[in-house]
Amino acid sequence: MVTVRADEIRKIIRERIEQYNREVNTLNTGTVLQVGDGIARINGLDEVMAGELVEFEEGTIGIALNLESKNVGVVLMGDGLMIKEGSSVKATGRIAQIPVGEAYLGRVINAQANPIDGRGKISSSAFRLIESSAPGIISRRSIYEPLQTGLIAIDSMIPIGRGQRELIIGDRQTGKTAVATDTIINQQGQNVICVYVAIGQKASSVAQVVTTLQERGAMEYTIVVAETADSPATLQYLAPYTGAALAEYFMYSERHTLIIYDDLSKQAQAYRQISLLLRRPPGREAYPGDVFYLHSRLLERAAKLSSKLGEGSMTALPIVETQSGDVSAYIPTNVISITDGQIFLSADLFNAGIRPAINVGISVSRVGSAAQIKAMKKVAGKLKLELAQFAELEAFAQFASDLDKTSQNQLARGQRLRELLKQSQSAPLTVAEQIMTIYTGINGYLDSLQLRQVRKFLLELCTYLKTNKPRFQEIISSTKTFTEEAEDLLKEAIRDQTDRFLVKEQA
């Protein structure tokens, strides 16, 4: 007969009691009332938060945007083709966040930070919220460091500083993306991390930008966030915030970043589509009432941080497309009022062969000379005024039959100054090269040359200066000032090269 040992039974029961873990899982769930056009109406989800992520039965993720009395309006981060009416939805208790880190450099990702370049997964342990609040007043400091674009017209007359928001605005096919990509290429060796956000672009256009950056070795320090024209409107709306979160990670790590949004017109259109489908009341041009807030909360995240926070910076170059040069439309006026200046690209200048087609007269940088080195400030001070006077005189000369000698000379000088502002795409110039070019034009050294010879002469002068007067580049790079020694070296080089050039041209 088996003896029952009470102490053993007691021990087993005690162990079982200790192992028992009473867990109560509460889920905030709802059911799908209707789905279509990237929008789902959900019944239930009583405790869902605005902007909270929700998960559908078949795995699609959505964002709760409209919290109404009878149902919740959710925008889908996918096509949602497998979602059925009556299927269950659960709230996740999280808001949208993405992994961030150094591993993203050189990669092409989508708005959910998933790689789309076919080069495998990206491992990262750090996370940032897609939407986070902008730095406050105390967290910032005034902008004082230049961000060189490599384009003479911008660096000399519309200077951009690290931490600035400078709008690039113009009609389609006027070279807006080219200005942005040239700026990225020019950051090589400057210790600046670049983020290029493509919103609603053709996939072929994005591929072309990536190829250009790879060929020039710029992808090493660049992240491309792409949501093409066939992406859901929700992801096109989120892409700029994903880019901003990645740039913020580096900014708060005491690094300098440059972010380009190409372009915010398409983001606004995607947001308008979402809002109209959610039956939000339309306003001007059918955009919802909070479309200004859509862009202001994004662009305010660009900043120059205080010394206490490490002096990191995030410079934003948003791009906005205009229709027939109309800058008084809703989105252009909104973004102009948010940013610290705008670079206006003109279709007329572009078609006249002046590229980059920057209309210097109406372009402005509200940071101004604070974002220029002393050498550039000294040399380029008169350039904008001279070009403005030239434009005025050129308009007058169309109606005048004969001009006096002074006016003719001023016209000739202006034409040469306009010629020296022309640059080939993907050929940014160093600061020393820009100073050399502007100094040569502004002081009349190009007046003796024919207009067609100007670019060839400047190219040869640049090569001659690098080879025979390397001290000039050293002075500009090390002191950031245009010293008497530098000026003497440059004058000497111009004289030598002018003699050689004219002899060669006459031969």
From Swiss-Prot:
The protein's Enzyme Commission number: 7.1.2.2
Keyword Signal found: no
One Pfam family per UniProt: ATP-synt_ab_C
Catalyses which reaction(s): ATP + H2O + 4 H(+)(in) = ADP + phosphate + 5 H(+)(out)
MF annotations from Gene Ontology: ADP binding; ATP binding; proton-transporting ATP synthase activity, rotational mechanism
Class of the enzyme per the UniProt entry, highest EC level: translocase
Keywords: ATP synthesis, ATP-binding, CF(1), Hydrogen ion transport, Ion transport, Membrane, Nucleotide-binding, Plastid, Translocase, Transport
Main location: plastid
Annotated compartments: Plastid membrane
Cellular-component GO terms for this entry: plastid membrane; proton-transporting ATP synthase complex
SUPFAM superfamilies: C-terminal domain of alpha and beta subunits of F1 ATP synthase, N-terminal domain of alpha and beta subunits of F1 ATP synthase, P-loop containing nucleoside triphosphate hydrolases
InterPro entries with a match to the protein in the record: ATP_synth_asu-like_sf, ATP_synth_asu_C, ATP_synth_asu_C_sf, ATP_synth_F1_a_nt-bd_dom, ATP_synth_F1_asu, ATPase_a/bsu_AS, ATPase_F1/V1/A1_a/bsu_N, ATPase_F1/V1/A1_a/bsu_N_sf
Binding site for ATP: 170-177
Top-level taxon in the UniProt lineage: Eukaryota
Topology with respect to the bilayer: Peripheral membrane protein
Residues of the site described as Required for activity: 363
Function: Produces ATP from ADP in the presence of a proton gradient across the membrane. The alpha chain is a regulatory subunit.
Family classification: Belongs to the ATPase alpha/beta chains family.
Subunit structure: F-type ATPases have 2 components, CF(1) - the catalytic core - and CF(0) - the membrane proton channel. CF(1) has five subunits: alpha(3), beta(3), gamma(1), delta(1), epsilon(1). CF(0) has four main subunits: a, b, b' and c.
PANTHER family for this protein: ATP SYNTHASE SUBUNIT ALPHA, MITOCHONDRIAL
Descriptive protein name: ATP synthase subunit alpha, plastid
Taxonomic placement: Eukaryota, Viridiplantae, Streptophyta, Embryophyta, Tracheophyta
Gene giving rise to this polypeptide: atpA
